[in-house]
Amino acid sequence: GIPDSAKSYDLTSYNGSYSSYGPYGTSPSPTHNDQEKEECEPEIRIVNGKPKKVRKPRTIYSSFQLAALQRRFQKTQYLALPERAELAASLGLTQTQVKIWFQ
């Protein structure tokens, strides 16, 4: 079964933040971002007979995103999952990007 603590979280925002950057309005051209995201899917190359994942290019955060992340970090250095999901969604980032930045 699902532990009681997990039931109270809003899982729709958790799942939604991975799917697209579009609806949050932080980006000047959402269509460009969607195209770029498709091209950045991790590609697998065969190197010396071994499959090798090609790393995604380093994320460039906008000054708006950085300012918001820094403000939040000054308030609290640790984000619980629902807070991370909410912050990621509000900034048009993935939860992974927010998690890595906080590390």
UniProtKB/Swiss-Prot annotation:
Transmembrane segments: none annotated. Residues 54-103 bind DNA. Its main location: nucleus. One of its GO terms (biological process) is negative regulation of transcription by RNA polymerase II. One of its GO terms (cellular component) is nucleus. Keywords: Activator, Developmental protein, Differentiation, DNA-binding, Homeobox, Nucleus, Transcription, Transcription regulation. Pfam families: Homeodomain (PF00046). This is Homeobox protein DLX-2. It comes from Eleutherodactylus coqui (Puerto Rican coqui).
